[in-house]
Amino acid sequence: MATITTKETRAFNWANPGTLKVGDEIVETLKDGREVVFVVMDDGVIGLKNLLGYHRMNKEWTNEGGWLACDMRRYLNEEVIALLPDALIAAIKPRKFGEEEDKLWLFSEMEVFGEHDWTENDPDRGFQFEYFKDRRNRIKVDEDGDAHWWWERSPNGSSSNSFCHVYSNGDASSYSASYTSGVCFGFYIQSSIYESAEPCAPR
């Protein structure tokens, strides 16, 4: 018997998102007119499907202080968040990092790849998000459609000047913090009903 697979398209409201499942895509228009695609990555986790421009982790070649001290954190939560629609900003649930909170954040090495030696002593590791278990979903393209490497928030545990990143082919690596590279951020949303292939790991 033949089968057919269809993809539903419907209007979307950040305040009342309805039932979502990993892999669902949400097309949104930024305040500067650019169109971006967000994707459901795990229970309560949404992130960019591809890259939103380029930025450095720090002005200098250092990873001292990790995510909490880096320039990328400031850039996302001051400049990038100002581009998001007000309805989306209102729906975002801040995420705690130690004693501080961020609405937007980069993914950690473990959230993308699962267990990895470079960050084994990093307390800010999390667990691998369901979406990234498929290596193809780790490959991100820029506005021209070209695959490019992109930053993670995890400092390289064996280096004082580099952060982890994802190669253009989806593999793991790290690079000096002052280099400009792809930006792919994530966020939590306030409330929704999710469908997931397996239960969400505890945070």
Question: Regions from the language model: what does each represent?
Answer:
Residues 2-203:
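Collagenous Gly-X-Y triple-helix signature in extracellular proteins
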